[in-house]
Regions:
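Covalent nucleotidyltransferase
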Residues: 14-124
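Nucleic-acid 5′ end/cap handling module spanning
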Residues: 2-46, 103, 123-272, 276-285
Length: 287
């Protein structure tokens, strides 16, 4: 038998999708699986936070997502990673469980029935909605996006628990997202600049400034991350709040070589992620 690995999702392929499927919101916290009385990350390393271990280590075989704060908050990845990947502290963390890994050959619906919520202790079973057609899936996705989540997870009701990544053809575990996200290594930094060039008005009445470098003034904080993408690089300069821009720039040496999680839309004409936006720093123990 292959060694245990968490089951991971692949992007869904509409042409391969077979109904009915079970659908739920895509959670974007920190993956957690309880094995041998230890809460483990996706990489099967212990979650560092003592409070997390104290609260959830008794939930043997539960597989789910740790969430700090609200599960549909736009900053949930950052707040969750910050809370559960440090040893000390008692973050406002909940465990949203969606699978049970004791018997990997058992059907998903049977494994799901083994899960139990414990609202008093912040343990919640993720509801699964049966979807019977592409029309129903599109309606469910619209509702999920309107509530603030960023995608949908799909499961075959008869799926086993696969050790590793499910394929689109298998359909055991799939994700429906209109954008992509991935982790990229930080290989450089660009400083944010203030454009002191004289403002002029275009023929359309819009204000514009020259991009002449001589009149650009360094602002002493991050303008963009330079990220590795295969044999090339690309820049990501959006998605940061003010504190992150200042902190990352001040501690560039510490962040160099770490991985940034980036949201992006397909690929541009230069074959690099298009319109990238920063989601957070991804702890290597959760990769």
């Amino acid at each position: 038998m292959k060694p245990f690995r968490p089951m991971l999702a692949s992007p869904f392929d509409e042409a391969l999708l077979k109904f009915p499927v079970l659908a739920s919101p895509k959670l974007d916290g920190v993956r957690a699986i309880v094995r041998d009385g230890v809460v483990l990350s996706r990489a099967l390393k212990p979650i560092p936070n003592k409070w997390v271990q104290q609260r959830f280590s008794h939930l043997e075989h539960f597989d789910g997502e740790l969430i700090v704060g609200k599960s549909n908050h736009p900053d949930v990845l950052r707040t969750t990673t910050s809370g559960v990947m440090r040893v000390e502290g008692e973050p406002d963390v909940s465990f949203h469980v969606f699978d049970h890994v004791e018997n990997h050959a058992r059907l998903y619906t049977a494994r799901y029935d083994l899960l139990q919520s414990d609202h008093q202790n912040n343990v919640f079973v993720v509801p699964q909605e049966e979807i019977g057609s592409l029309f129903e899936l599109n309606a469910f996705e619209r509702d999920i996006l309107a509530q603030g989540w960023e995608g949908v997870m799909l499961r075959r009701p008869d799926a086993p628990y696969k050790f590793g990544r499910s394929t689109a053809r298998e359909g055991y575990l799939l994700k429906v997202k209109r954008f992509h996200d991935a982790e990229f290594e930080i290989v450089g930094f660009e400083e944010e600049m203030f454009n002191a060039n004289e403002a002029t008005t275009s023929e359309l009445g819009r204000t514009k400034r020259s991009s002449h470098k001589a009149n650009k003034i360094p602002k002493g904080r991050l303008g963009a991350l330079v990220l590795k993408y295969g044999d090339t690089t690309f820049n990501c300069g959006t998605g940061f709040n003010d504190a992150e821009r200042e902190n990352i720039w001040a501690e560039r040496e510490r962040y160099l070589g770490q991985f940034a999680k980036i949201k992006y839309f397909a690929h541009g004409i230069k074959d690099v992620p298009k319109l990238p936006s920063f989601l957070g720093i991804r702890d290597v123990r959760d990769m």
